[in-house]
């Protein structure tokens, strides 16, 4: 008998594949990909979901037969058969009856406890610090606990993320290490961040008892601030208009797909896959409030897979994050609060009122259409969710031509592209090579279907 267990939210991935003779499991998908006896048959639904959502839903991966464990799951393999069970249900967390004042105070106590448990006896700690609320909440508690905190910032120059983080670090008198980056690093934000941090550690620039265990605010904006939810979405769900609710969710979360890339007969099928996938996930949660079901959809899909790229390469970069916002006791407390109160950072903003006073003496960056920071922010700073800076003509043309060659390579490669016709890729290649319009997003989507 073999049993695999995942953590309560499934934040650390465990992939598995089995046939009648063996079970193969690993914490990195690339391990299974490297094994010749594990079939690599593309799952078109998994690929389409990755393009639209950024990740496959549920236990799906991009390969048929290869699964990833869900939240709080036990998968049991035996000669009598395989079973999957849950040892914890997030939808069974009861709603707490308490005043808003008591809620913010108790949340602060629980959050402080989660940080102290993870800090152990460390005197010096390293923590990421951006211009937002999540990392500031962590740094504020660490600093209040008496730890010597060195902060690390990896944001573009003259951005709110950089300037507000620096101002807060200076306000409470702690070191601030900043490495300005491009708005969109070529190899992705997470890879670029990991490389920067690894280099800093290897050069001895991060003064911490456990420099490989940096504190990170991942999980705060969705878990506490209800990002990707709004009041209209809750209203639609409670009125039973689930399809309209999902459509609204796709809009506010900017979830889309380049349907014109596909054959006409496949477009409706793919679109229906997205709606059905979300509906199936909502049906898993037996919540009295349909709004809570959508929150849990985000937690056990978007947030569960939020740090997969970090944990899958743990053996390569050797970085282990401290993630108090993913603490199960803290999340259980947050789940017990009314979802309306948590929406749009309403609870989060009230929660800030019980943090040390210095936490609120420097402005912080907020999400669009969420509760605004009461302090004024310099207008000359770039905003994370604002329009991207304009490219130079040369950079724009160069980028499109590069994408055109990629499209041409895909079209001429004999590898299977599933529902993507080669004729469309050739047309895309022509448009991109002539720099007529930017369809690089469609080229990247087509590349995900490539197999072989």
Regions found by a protein language model. Give the residues of each.
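N-terminal segments that mediate ammonia production and transfer
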Residues: 2-98
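ATP-dependent adenylate-handling active sites, centered on carboxylate activation for C-N bond formation
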Residues: 3, 11-14, 18-21, 79-81, ...
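Helix N-cap / beta->alpha transition motif
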Residues: 28, 43, 262-263, 418-421
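Short beta-alpha junction loops
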Residues: 30-31, 156-157, 367
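PAPS-dependent sulfotransferase catalytic core
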Residues: 357-437
